[in-house]
Amino acid sequence: LVKGHPFFTESPFCMKHIIDIDAWERRDNYGFFRSFVNSWYSVTTEIDCTEASAAARAAKRSFFLYYLYAVVRSANEVDELRYRTDKEGRVVFHDRVDIISPIAVPGKTFYTVRIPYHEDFERFYAEAHALITDIPEDGDPYGAEKILAEQGDYDVVHLSAVPKMYFTSITYTLAEAGNG
């Protein structure tokens, strides 16, 4: 997408663009799937991470952060993975999506952290490392999720990584009216 493209209007925040559904080439797909209880999709695949894991070890860095970066970078390189529906029910296109991941906290279960995407790996790594090593003891484990729900812009990719656990597919809960 580029400025002036005929099927979106720019939001004042310049991070998301409101799609004109009537002029959108995916209008029919959207109309078909929009009423599904779970219209989300997830991709589960096996990836050989041997070289990436070795590179992280050699650099004395977190393989987990290498992995998060690879996932969020890939999502940002594919336009179709940056479309969302906002709290007003409008389809929006985000210039950038961040990543949310649960981080294990000693003595507790986990803490959900939103890590901003930066194309520059070093900047991403430094900020992500600072965020996951400075989780407040008395913080809300679902704070990042609650902020997303309040703002109504789901400009993120959700990723849970469980080290050394083999599985071929997983889905997660999705809060919706009536199940609460």
What are these regions (language model features)?
Residues 7-8, 13:
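Aromatic (phenylalanine/tyrosine) cluster motif
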Residues 15-44, 64, 154-180:
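Flexible, Gly/Pro-enriched loop and linker segments at secondary-structure and domain junctions
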Residues 105-167:
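Helical lid/core segments from catalytic subdomains that handle acyl or acyl-like groups
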